[in-house]
UniProtKB/Swiss-Prot annotation:
Residue spans binding DNA: 9-68
Family: Belongs to the H2.0 homeobox family.
InterPro entries: H2.0_Homeobox_NeuralPatt, HD, HD_metazoa, Homeobox_CS, Homeodomain-like_sf, HTH_motif
Function: Appears to perform a very early function in establishing the identity of a subset of cells that originate in the region of the ventricular zone in the developing spinal cord and in the hindbrain.
A molecular function GO annotation: DNA-binding transcription factor activity, RNA polymerase II-specific
Pfam families: Homeodomain
Signal peptide (UniProt feature, chain positions): none
Natural source organism: Gallus gallus
Annotated Gene Ontology cellular component terms: nucleus
This protein's name: Homeobox protein DBX2
Gene Ontology biological process terms from the UniProt entry: regulation of transcription by RNA polymerase II
Swiss-Prot/TrEMBL keywords: Developmental protein, DNA-binding, Homeobox, Nucleus
PROSITE patterns: HOMEOBOX_1, HOMEOBOX_2
Gene name as annotated: DBX2
Superkingdom: Eukaryota
Amino acid sequence: ESNSKARRGILRRAVFSEDQRKALEKMFQKQKYISKTDRKKLAINLGLKESQVKIWFQNRRMKWRNSKEKEVLSNRCLQEGLQENYLSQSAMNFASPCPSVWEVSQEQTSPRWKEKSPGNSERLTSTQPPPRANSSQSPLYLYPDHDTANKAVTSSD
């Protein structure tokens, strides 16, 4: 069976040494797509076949894309959790990939927290204002640049 695989060009999984991995990673940080000449040079320097370098770069790009997508998704979840959105997502027919803040808070409540928490009627009848945020804390911005006051919002009616 190994003879038939060899004839079809199917290779076993390459096991790279630490030095080879470091050199490949270093090149990947410089450029996500490697040119044919760079691939040839790198393969010679590392004692690998060009096809191994090519496949390593393909696999590494896929890993890089997947990690970027996960990062974007987790940032979206974070922003969704921080936004004060009183509209029901189900009413807008929008399914979120993130659990709602309510769902997470329900999973993480402890009996001690419930004992110390005022009851519903006590919360509704309380005349005390809600606690104020500490003004010495720096504000949290959800936008890449926090100079949003100068940005005009236009609507298309």
